[in-house]
A protein has these predicted regions:
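N-terminal subdomain of nucleotide-sugar transferases
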Residues: 1-64, 106-108
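Acidic donor-binding loop of glycosyltransferase active sites
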Residues: 182, 291-308, 319-322
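Donor nucleotide-sugar binding/catalytic pocket of nucleotide-sugar-dependent glycosyltransferases
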Residues: 134, 164-167, 171-216
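Acceptor-binding helix/loop patch of EC 2.4 sugar-transfer enzymes
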Residues: 8, 75-90, 135-172, 231
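A short, well-ordered alpha-helix in the C-terminal region of glycosyltransferases
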Residues: 363-378, 384-390
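Conserved acidic donor-binding segment of nucleotide-sugar-dependent glycosyltransferases
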Residues: 341-348, 356-362
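Short hydrophobic beta-strand element within catalytic cores of glycosyltransferases
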Residues: 312-316, 322-326
Length: 400
């Protein structure tokens, strides 16, 4: 099968949740004997990292990227607001990207065009014009729901009003265009149910993010350490950590002064990089995420907004880490609270769950071991790739 994968940002190297999810599709399909061509958007925020783009990957995928200016332009944002357009989507519309996509479709034949995110939906018409391929949306999240959650949690009235407008415009766009695809591959069953409830008439599948991560040997986790790793240019990550630092960390530090908190991730805000808070170590981007995760004890993920599945939680669980997260953070994972994950939705609950792990290292280790078993059993990339290919076939995608 020949698949054209359209990505909303460069999927390689896989440095955050979105890139890990996209790259797992690429690698899974190629490992199963299918041919994949990758065409990606790149931007100032997410440039092509030529120094880290391995020749083997580039040759195997025929990787290409087209620059789009995704920066926020106040005038364009205001016009979109007045016209009721989704500015989130409009920023991805590019003549240059459309022209390159057209050229590729005219040169090569594809069985499936796999589109990563609703933000690239404007290019479905181009695919239909130049190809008979089945068009599949990989819905990483229900995007408008995330923006609605962020708006609800925003205290500034004017900012909250604007974010609600963005969420409404994005929802209107999703509802208008969700049936443009031949099928939608969601990350979670909950997201699939949401799309169905909002009028999706096309086939839906829930196919989680897959991982194939080997345990890191010869790395001892530092005792009494908490850590968070995640791209801080994704708004729910930043807002969750700021909430944790303000509402939770003072309580933990008061009750357990020996515990240290390590914060890692790309695009760490300057004020966090420079913060001086006792017991908190801000390291920013790390060269080896798996090694960093393995070297710490307890993963905290204080997400208050989001849908889909949190890739970094899956990664930490696959490495045998105990994860303390919110109900929102754990959404989409087939877990049992207290067995493979620990749930905390309030500051006091976070304190209690962290204390359980610190006071009982054996319990902490057993939860981490159960987490790894769960991921190996249900989130193997090989098995999930077969489900994705099965979904392609169900839609009528037949190898040329």
């Amino acid at each position: 099968m020949h698949v054209l994968q359209l990505c909303y940002k460069p999927p390689y190297p896989p440095v955050d949740g979105g890139t890990l999810a996209m790259n797992s599709v690429t690698q899974g399909l190629m490992a199963s004997g299918h041919k994949v061509k990758v065409l990606s958007v790149c931007s100032d925020k997410h440039p092509v990292r030529s120094d880290a783009l391995e020749t083997q990957y580039k040759d195997a995928t025929g990787f290409e990227a087209v620059y789009i200016d995704l920066s926020i332009h106040p005038l364009d944002a205001a016009v979109s607001l007045l016209c009721g357009e989704s500015y989130n989507v409009k920023r991805f519309v590019s003549k240059e990207f459309d022209e390159r996509l057209t050229a590729i479709l005219q040169i090569e034949s594809f069985d499936v065009v796999h589109i990563e995110s609703i933000f690239l939906a404007p290019y479905v018409a181009t695919v239909r014009k130049h190809s008979d391929a089945k068009v599949v949306l990989r819905a990483h999240n229900v995007e408008h729901r995330i923006w609605r959650q962020i708006a609800t949690a925003t205290r500034n009235p004017l900012k909250r009003w604007y974010l609600k407008k963005l969420a409404l415009a994005l929802r209107a766009y999703e509802l208008e265009h969700i049936n443009d695809f031949d099928g939608i591959a969601c990350i979670t069953a909950n997201d699939a149910e949401t799309f169905r409830g909002e009028g999706c008439r096309k086939p839906l599948a829930d196919i989680p993010f897959g991982v194939d991560i080997e345990p890191i040997d010869n790395v001892d986790a530092e005792p009494q350490t908490l850590f968070h790793i995640g791209s801080m240019d994704w708004r729910p990550n930043e807002e969750g950590i700021r909430w944790f630092l303000k509402e939770v960390w003072p309580l933990i530090h008061k009750e357990m002064p020996a515990v240290r908190l390590f914060l890692a991730g790309r695009k760490m805000p300057d004020d966090l990089m420079q913060m001086q808070s006792e017991g908190v170590v801000v390291v920013g981007e790390v060269p080896d995420a798996a090694y960093f995760i393995a070297s710490k004890q307890i993963n905290i993920v204080p997400l208050m907004a989001g849908s889909g599945i949190r890739v970094k939680i899956i990664e930490a669980m696959s490495l045998g880490k105990t994860v303390v997260t919110t109900s929102v953070g754990a959404a989409g994972i087939d877990y049992t609270d207290g067995k493979e994950l620990l749930i905390a939705d309030t500051p006091q609950q976070f304190v209690e769950q962290v204390r359980r792990c610190i006071d009982d290292p054996e319990l902490c280790s057993s939860i981490g071991a159960a987490a790894r078993r769960l991921i190996l059993d249900k989130y193997s990339n090989e098995a999930l790739t077969q489900r994705l290919v099965g979904f392609y076939n169900k839609l009528g995608a037949v190898a040329l």
